[in-house]
Amino acid sequence: MSSVEDLFDKLNADLAPGQEKRLNFDDIKLKGENLPGEPVDFSHGDVDAFEPVPGALENFNYGFNEIGGTQAYTVYRGREDILDDVAKKLSDYSSTSIDPENELIITPGTQGALFLAVGATITRGDKVAIIEPDYYANRKLVHFFQGELYPVQLDYLNHEDKAGIDLEKLENSFKDGVSTFIFSNPNNPSGVVYSKEEITEIAELVRKYDVNVIVDELYSRQLFDGRTYTHLASLDIIPKENIVTIIG
């Protein structure tokens, strides 16, 4: 049995996300001239600093000075008025119906949401399918909760109109007893977007084998070149108790 220290060691990372397999400059040939200006760190999703939205400071001061109680501890799932507002906006955005009382939890960031979702669905010895490549923390969290990994390859370099998931291998993993499937859409780090056909086939397989699925849709707003996006929950194929959607 692993100690608490051993488990938390599995979450450690010496480098920032996206830098765990950095190339040595001796291994690549740099082409072109140096570009002017400040360097941009592309190892994270936030590549720029954004000022607060208009009215943010005024509303914060109003809540702090006039209401007061908004700065006290709140219920763990989030304040009711915020849940109602977020549920409405997410329902409109994702083309699905979200019950704010029973189907929505507000967390301090999507990493916290991912930790809660994995911890709620995986226990020691559970078989878990993940995509390779995908968000680096997926693998770490499965190890932390002592699950057994089943990697499924994403052939994203050879497709332009889809992500390139190996659906046959995914189904075989379900046949072998995988109980939870974790993936991000758009894929992090490649940025490819799953086609509607791929998302539909994933949903059909999840329902057929009664698998839990955790889908990270954090970057679903960052679509380019006329790409279309299909929210997994919007297909209404998977029972709601079998799907967790993470979005920010």
Residue ranges with predicted function:
Residues 5-7, 13-109, 116:
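N-terminal small-domain helix-loop-helix segment of the aminotransferase-like
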Residues 69-205, 220-245:
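Conserved core of the PLP fold type I
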Residues 213-214:
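Residue-level marker for buried hydrophobic side chains located in beta-strands
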Residues 217:
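Walker B catalytic acidic pair
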Residues 248:
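Class I S-adenosyl-L-methionine
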